[in-house]
């Protein structure tokens, strides 16, 4: 992808995997707050988490969460049926990508491989 704004620092990391823990709305909010704290990223509001509550396709039910950072934000998308998660960390300050992946893997008690890509 071509960098259209080379003077603006951005670090983006996508992490995906299959979770084994019991997860609800509060759990998604806890993850968002804890991953930010673990990486030393500063939040300016509490995480917000939404659930479509039966709207849309059954296989897409789960949670969508976001925590705003002083330097951008973290989003989490969780599918309840297949027990799949997809997390996007987007910051205008640097963070340790390996620490983010390992924290996420452990927090979700991921089964099998966890995939990640920075861009």
Q: Which stretches of residues belong to each language-model region?
A:
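Polybasic/polar functional segments that serve as interface/processing modules
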Residues: 1-119
């Amino acid at each position: 992808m071509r960098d259209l704004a080379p003077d603006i620092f951005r670090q983006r990391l996508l992490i995906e995997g299959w979770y084994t823990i019991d997860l609800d709305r509060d759990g998604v909010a806890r993850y968002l707050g804890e991953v930010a704290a673990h990486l030393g990223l500063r939040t300016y509001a509490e995480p917000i988490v939404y659930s479509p509550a039966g709207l849309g396709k059954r296989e897409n039910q789960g949670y969508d969460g976001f925590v705003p950072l002083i330097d951008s934000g973290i989003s989490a998308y969780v599918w309840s049926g297949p027990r799949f998660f997809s997390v996007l960390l987007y910051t205008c300050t640097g963070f340790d990508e390996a620490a983010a992946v390992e924290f996420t893997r452990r927090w979700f008690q991921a089964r099998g491989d966890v995939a990640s890509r920075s861009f």
